[in-house]
Amino acid sequence: MNKGKIKQIIGSVLDIEFENGELPEIYNALEIETNVSGKKETIIAEVQTHIGGKAVRAIALSSTDGLIRGQEVSNTGKPISVPVGDATLGRIFNVLGKTIDEGPAITVKETRPIHRAAPSFDELTSKTEVFETGIKVIDLLAPYIKGGKTGLFGGAGVGKTVLIQELINNIAKQHGGFSVFAGVGERTREGNDLWREMKESGVIDKTVLCYGQMNEPPGARLRVALSALTMAEHFRDSIGTDVLLFVDNIFRFSQAGSEVSALLGRMPSAVGYQPTLSTEMGALQERITSTKKGSITSVQAIYVPADDLTDPAPANAFAHLDATTVLSRAISDKGIYPAVDPLDSTSRVMNAQVLGEEHYLVAREVQRILQRYKDLQDIIAILGMDELSEDDKVLVARARKIEKFLSQPFHVAEVFTGAPGKYVKLADTVRSFKEVISGNYDHLPEQAFYMVGSIDDAIEKAKGYKG
C-alpha cells in the first residue's frame, strides 16, 4: 500500500506528499489513522487534485481534529465504495457506507464505488407514465412521471421536507418498491424523525437511508448523494426493479461543492458558486435515470435561497427535471398546505395524449380560473368586489373554493394538525375538481373545501356548518 505524509492542513483540505512519486489517482480514498483522546479512528480523505510531481490535495470526509503535519497516510488504491443489495434495507448509512443506526453489523456481499459513469445512450429507455402520489394539487396540475425527475422548489420553512415525507409515506405504502433516501446537509432532527416515522409505519424494511447532515464537513455533504445513488443503481440494475430516490436537499449538494471548491483554491464564478457547478450537477443527475433493466424515479427537494429562483444553484437543477413543484410563501401564509403554487408548478406530461382528455381539460380550466382570480386581485384590492361583473363575482367565489380545495391533510402531519391524513386517488381528484369548476357546489361554504380529501369529504364537512 502506497504511503505518504501530511504536508499541510487547512480545515477539511489536506496536502499530502508521496515521496516515492507514486501518486494516487483522482477520487482514490486515502486512510489516516488518528488517536484523539485515546480513541482510535480512521479518517478517510478523497483525492481531488495533483499538485506538483509528488503531492496531492485531498478533502477529508470527516472531522480533521487531531491530525498533525507529518502524519502517515495510506492510499487504498480505489475510490470510496459502499455496500449494496438487500442487506442495506432498513438501515441508516453515512457517506462511507458505514451503518450509523447502532444496529447489528451488516454482512456485506458486494460493494460498489460511488464514482460511476452514467448509463450509455443505448441503455436508456423513456416511459411516459403518470406516477400517482395521492396529493391532489400535484396529481391534477403538475403530475409526476414514472422514472422521471421531480424538483420541489421552495424557500425556508414552506414545507419541502414535510411534502417529501408525505410522498415517502404514500408511495412506500401504495407503490411497494424500494426507496432510497439521501439526506444531504439537512437537519439531524429531521433525519431522526423520518427514521422513527418509517419504523412506526412499517415502511423502513423497504427503504435505505443515507445521511450526510448539516454538521458534517463539506466533503461528506458533497459525496453522500453519490453514495445513496450508488445503492439505488444496484436495485435498478441487478434486481431490475423500480426504485424511488428521495434527495433532501439538492441545494446543499451545490453548497457543499461551493465550500470544497473554495477550500481547494478554485476561482469562484457567479454568486460565489464553484466554476464546476453545472458539471457536478450533471454528473449526479445523469446517473438518476431509467434503463431497460429498471427505473429510478427521483424526487428532490431544492432550497431556493432568498426565494430567488434565478439563483445559479436552483436554476441549474431546473434543466434536469421533468416536473417542478414550486412551493410558495404567499400560499403558506394563507394557511394552505401543501403550499404548492398551482400556476408556477409544471410537468412535461401536461398534455391530453398522456393524461387523457378529461384530466387535461379539468386541469387547464382550474388554472384558467386561478389565473383570472390573480388578475382580478388588484381590482378587488382597490375598488372592492362590488365593481366586478356578475360573471367575475361567480369566478372569484369559485377560485377561492378551488384554492382551499387544493389543500390536503397529510398523514405525516397528523400529530401537529389533529386531522387524519388523506390519500386521494387520481380519478377522485379529477372527478372532484370537475364538479367544482362546473359550479355544482357553488352553494357550499368556502370553508367546507379546506383541508379535506375528495369532494365527498367537502360535502360531509359542509353538513356540519349547516347544523
UniProtKB/Swiss-Prot annotation:
PANTHER family: ATP SYNTHASE, ATP SYNTHASE SUBUNIT BETA, MITOCHONDRIAL. CDD domains: ATP-synt_F1_beta_C (cd18110), ATP-synt_F1_beta_N (cd18115), F1-ATPase_beta_CD (cd01133). NCBIfam families: atpD (TIGR01039). It is found in: Cell inner membrane. It catalyses: ATP + H2O + 4 H(+)(in) = ADP + phosphate + 5 H(+)(out). The lineage of its organism: Bacteria, Pseudomonadati, Spirochaetota, Spirochaetia, Leptospirales. SUPFAM superfamilies: C-terminal domain of alpha and beta subunits of F1 ATP synthase, N-terminal domain of alpha and beta subunits of F1 ATP synthase, P-loop containing nucleoside triphosphate hydrolases. One of its GO terms (cellular component) is proton-transporting ATP synthase complex. ATP binds at G154, G155, A156, G157, V158, G159, K160, T161. Its EC number is 7.1.2.2. This is ATP synthase subunit beta.
